[in-house]
Amino acid sequence: MVTSTRDRVPLNTDACINASIRRKTENNIAYYASGGSDAITRRLAELDQEWDIERMLETNAATATLIGMTLGITVSKKWFVVPAVIAGFLLQHAVQGWCPPLPILRRMGFRTASEIDYERYALKALRGDFRNVSEAGTAGHALAAAEC
C-alpha cells in the first residue's frame, strides 16, 4: 500500500508521539506569538534551519551505507550486506512511510516537513504576512505572500 507523502510518517508513528509533536508545535506558536513580530521572525529563521525527518533518515542511511561499503572493501565482503539492507529500508520508507529508525527519530522530536510548515505558516499568519491576500484576492498577491 502506498500512502500519501504528507501522511505516511504520521500514519506510521504512535498516536501519543504524534500528539506530543503537535502539542510542542502549538506551544511554540503560542510562545512566539506572544513575543511579537521580532520573535516570530527569529523563530522563522530557526525553522529554516530545522532538519525534517526525511533529511535525518537520508543522512543516517547515507552514513551507514558508506560505512558498510568501506568495511566491505577493507575488512570483509560480508559487510556489503549493510548497504543492501539499508536500500531495502529506504525503499520501504518511500513506499509505506515506515523504516526501523523512524520510531526512534520521532521520539527524539524530528518532525515532517508538513509539521514544520504548519508552524511556519501559523506564525506567518500571526505576523500578518497573508493580510493582503484576502483583501486583494488575486493569485499574484497569494504567490507573493507564499514567498515570504
Give the ranges of each region predicted by the language model.
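Membrane-cytosol interface motif
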Residues: 110-119
